[in-house]
From Swiss-Prot:
GO-annotated molecular function: glutaminyl-peptide cyclotransferase activity; zinc ion binding
Name of this protein: Uncharacterized protein YFR018C
CDD domains according to UniProt: M28_QC_like
Pfam families: Peptidase_M28
Keywords for this protein: Acyltransferase, Transferase
Transmembrane regions: none
Keyword Acyltransferase: yes
Organism: Saccharomyces cerevisiae (strain ATCC 204508 / S288c) (Baker's yeast)
A GO cellular-component term linked to this record: endoplasmic reticulum
Superkingdom in the source lineage: Eukaryota
Amino acid sequence: MGMKYVLPLRLIGLAYLLVLFQVHRVTGWELSYEQYHAAHLNEAINPDSGWNKSTKNLLLPFNRTRVPGSEGSREIQRFIIEHFNNTLAGEWAVETQAFEENGYRFNNLVMTLQNNASEYLVLAAHYDTKIAPTGMVGAIDSAASCAALLYTAQFLTHIACHERTKEYNDLESNTVVSNSTLGVKIVFFDGEEAIEEWGPEDSIYGARRLAAQWLADGTMTRIRLLFLLDLLGSGEEEPLVPSYYAETHQEYQLLNRIEDDLLFRRGDEINGESALAAEVARQRKHLDPTDYRFLGLGHSVIGDDHTPFLAAGVPVLHAIPLPFPSTWHTVDDDFRHLDAAETRHWALLVCEFVVQSLRSRNQ
């Protein structure tokens, strides 16, 4: 995340709440989303270097600098592309957008599920890191967000594969992915950070380039929502993520209801999933739908990858805390200061948000 926020905010008091995720009936047999997460989430999103040998870890590969055009950047690009092409069994269409600007080589990565959908929900984060300070790996900025999106893609692929079984084919009205007119795009932006000093020509390189392409080819008119994640996963007392735009406050309220389900649901539905339940029990609220401070402004208070899409009329849901965590743009933005539970919490929220968004189009 590049630009500083505009308005100083006070830290809101936080409560630590309880417990578990909702079980959904999606077919003739119960596919428990909570059970899927209990089986896969901890291994997929774990910053502990002891998990280095796990090929299923989606977070640790980001524990490196990812300056545009560098070998670290190329390695993480290969990792992301391989995740979609191989690990996810080719369910997603993979596009790259390579270009040069200001003396640097950039490459956006765009992944699409349901390539022929009439509209798209776009999930996005940037994968690059700042040039200075030297050695900054950008754990919250934005390795954690990228890992959450990779996990969301894995989760959606799991659902899509099951929907091709006979049980799902016999109960089409209960499908989530297959019959939705809403597709999903996951975008990994390059070049969000400034090369020298943040400004309109030295920032959000990838977002500006992709927005121009989507305006030219008509894709922009098919984007129902851009859901952008940034600066998530801090281990400190992270401030709340406010609702920034009146146009998407309804989507923000949906995300808030999902978080309430996650935090308030009691343990009688756990059925032995104690490890995940204990982790959820330590979580707190991140959203406050009664905070209307920004809804009447009619403009952004934060410069980020969403701005060219917002200017083009795309509704934006921006998940970024304000004020920013204290490790922002310092060498302390590393994996020692990254909170795995916070990162997993956001992965769960995004997964359920996408499922409910797709389901709403099937009704």
